[in-house]
Amino acid sequence: MVTMLFKKLSDASEAEMKKLISRGSGLADVGETVSSVLSDVRVRGDAALREYTKKFDKVELAGFEVSEAEFEEALSGVGPELLEHLKVAAANIRVFHEAQLPETTWFMEVQPGVVLGQKATALESVGAYAPGGRASYPSTVLMTVIPARVAGVKQVIVCTPPRADGSIHPLTLAAAKVAGADKVFKLGGVQAVGAMAYGTETVPKVDKIVGPGNVFVTSAKMQVRNVAEIDFPAGPSEVLIIADDSADAAMVASDIIAQAEHDPNAVSVLVTTSEILAEAVRQEVLLQAENTARSEIVKTSLENAAVLISDTLEQSIDFSNKFAPEHLEIMVEDSDFVLNRIKNAGSIFVGNYAPVPVGDYASGTNHVLPTAGYARIYSGLNINHFLKYSSIQKISKSGLESLKETIIALAEEEGLQAHADAIRTRFGYKPSK
């Protein structure tokens, strides 16, 4: 029997609200285990990778890197129609992320003789993690590799868990080829993150690790962030839907089910001003849960779901901003009213014909997004995750002279005499005398 939280938002207890909004990621529960695996990978390299792949993925591998022959076999096994669909999605992803590219170098004169600028430089290397296990995610390969390539990253590798026979799903390998990955490794979980962070005999160390994963992968990313930069915590998937009586109950329910099939820990929430819609969605969710292919996962996930009835649209918006969802769907008559008031959301889907799967696969926006409330402080994966910025100063003698007294006064106030003298020497002062 599926049980979802169903009540008026104003009647929900403090404990119920805290559970929904905090929706604990479980990072603390797995931290010690993750730390142990990471340490082992750092010390023993490939030997540790083989051991953990056998333990967690139940497969013994002779080697981790996907060979060219395996790529060719995979591509021959993917039908031309499916390959074309990959290319359609890839094209949209590429166009959207190209639009995000900043001017490589720019300058401005803030006052005569003082020219300032900024230079954007791509990272040298990036490791993309694509989950496996319950399903293969070629779409995640596109979402992580293509922006890195658009940004100009020189080396992009992919780690994804092997199947029971030691292979990688052909469509995942096809996606890696379409996206432009340099290498693909048959590695998943904590050990994959450790390999990319520290480097092993086989896996090169990277500057940054991006991509979603389960709580173990997320914990691993958080723990290695002083060795290799990461994008953000991206754990179990979630959606919050703001709807009014103009929304279609079957559509809303199908979007809840779609999110629930990702993972038993996925979170799906509807907040609506319509009691009639709320009840209709609840009934529709129960019906659809029985008939979907991944019914058991969906039913488990729905234990984390909620249907909440708000007094006003403003109350719905306020709750959404506190919840800070990974995915936010807006299915109301006046969508701009809601959109303009949203502060915290990873990706926003506006209207009845913009369900989350559109962004998951083919619209072109990125589906690697912060979860568990981290949308309050993080942006979804974008071109800037693959770039770093250097500020530039071009100062003439007259420009420095105009700032001389200000710099000297502030440096001396901070007790940094040599800083002040570095300015004076450019105007005849000899600090050695």
Curated annotation (Swiss-Prot):
What GO terms in the biological process aspect are recorded for it?
Answer: L-histidine biosynthetic process
Q: What class of enzyme is it?
A: oxidoreductase
Q: Which SUPFAM superfamilies match?
A: ALDH-like (SSF53720)
State the InterPro entries in the record.
Answer: Ald_DH/histidinol_DH, Histidinol_DH_CS, Histidinol_DH_monofunct, Hstdl_DH
Q: What is this protein called?
A: Histidinol dehydrogenase
Q: What HAMAP family does this protein's entry cite?
A: HisD (MF_01024)
Molecular functions per Gene Ontology: histidinol dehydrogenase activity; NAD binding; zinc ion binding
Pathway terms, separated by semicolons: Amino-acid biosynthesis; L-histidine biosynthesis; L-histidine from 5-phospho-alpha-D-ribose 1-diphosphate: step 9/9
Q: What organism is the protein native to?
A: Methanosarcina acetivorans (strain ATCC 35395 / DSM 2834 / JCM 12185 / C2A)
Q: Which residues cross the membrane?
A: none
Residues bound to substrate:
237, 259, 262, 327, 360, 414, 419
Q: Is Transcription tagged as a keyword?
A: no
Catalytic activity entry: L-histidinol + 2 NAD(+) + H2O = L-histidine + 2 NADH + 3 H(+)
Q: Which UniProt keywords are given for this protein, alphabetically ordered?
A: Amino-acid biosynthesis, Histidine biosynthesis, Metal-binding, NAD, Oxidoreductase, Zinc
Tell me how the cofactor is bound: Binds 1 zinc ion per subunit.
Keyword Oxidoreductase found: yes
Instruction: Quote the record's binding site residues for NAD(+).
Output: 129, 191, 214
The Enzyme Commission number assigned here is: 1.1.1.23
